[in-house]
Regions:
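Acidic, serine/threonine-rich low-complexity disordered tracts
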Residues: 1-51, 98-199
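Active-site/ligand-binding surface loops and adjacent short beta/alpha elements
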Residues: 53-114
Length: 199
């Protein structure tokens, strides 16, 4: 993931993530989450969250977090047991006929949030590469639960309508996955968009 558009002028970063897990009883169950990032200012970090029985049991990072930031096992269990990692939280199981009815909860070991959609899905065609794709568009907002500092950014993404997802259903996976995401920020829209699709 890279910052794009006007946001890239002010916020330069590159992020790489990897998420592993299984589907059990129509639910995504995380097992391992790996992440790394590099900012335009030269700061970087890589790390992972290890899960056991759908509960995060260990957060490791290099460089490590400050002692005051390192979460306790109780904190990990409280906010992680009902959550997914931030990227598998983007996915919706195919048992939902409307992905907008799903309330996602993401947790990165330090911060927890919900993604809440405010209306039913509406069909919309978009271009992914050279392919025209029929999607289900969801409009909503982020509900920060713990770990976030007050900021203009937080105020912006908490407004209803500040988050737009374009979901496509993938038959082979029985999953809805967003092929395009726009998040409003004080600096403009932050855009994530697929470059090619395989079903």
């Amino acid at each position: 993931v890279e910052a794009a558009g006007i946001v890239d002028v002010f916020v330069k970063f590159i992020s790489t993530t990897e998420s592993e897990g299984v589907i059990n009883n129509n639910k995504l169950v995380p097992e391992l989450y790996k992440f790394s990032y590099l900012t335009g200012r030269g700061s970087s970090r890589k790390g992972s969250i290890t899960y056991k029985d759908n509960i995060p049991i260990r957060l490791t990072a290099e460089p490590n977090y400050d002692d005051s930031e390192i979460p306790s096992l109780e904190f990990l269990e409280e906010y992680g047991s009902t959550s997914n990692d931030p990227y598998s939280a983007l996915l919706v199981h195919g048992s939902y006929s409307d992905p907008c009815k799903f309330i996602a909860q993401g947790f990165d070991g330090l911060r927890s949030f919900k993604t809440i959609f405010v209306r039913a899905a509406r069909e919309e065609k978009i271009k992914i590469g050279e392919q025209e794709v029929v999607t289900s568009k969801c409009i909503g907002y982020f509900d920060p639960m713990v770990g976030y500092k007050e900021s203009d950014f937080l105020d912006e993404i908490s407004k209803p309508g500040s988050v737009r997802y374009w979901f496509k259903y993938f038959d082979s996976l029985d999953l809805w996955a967003p092929v395009k995401v726009i998040i409003d920020t004080p600096l403009g829209g932050f855009v994530l968009k697929g470059t090619a699709l395989k079903n």
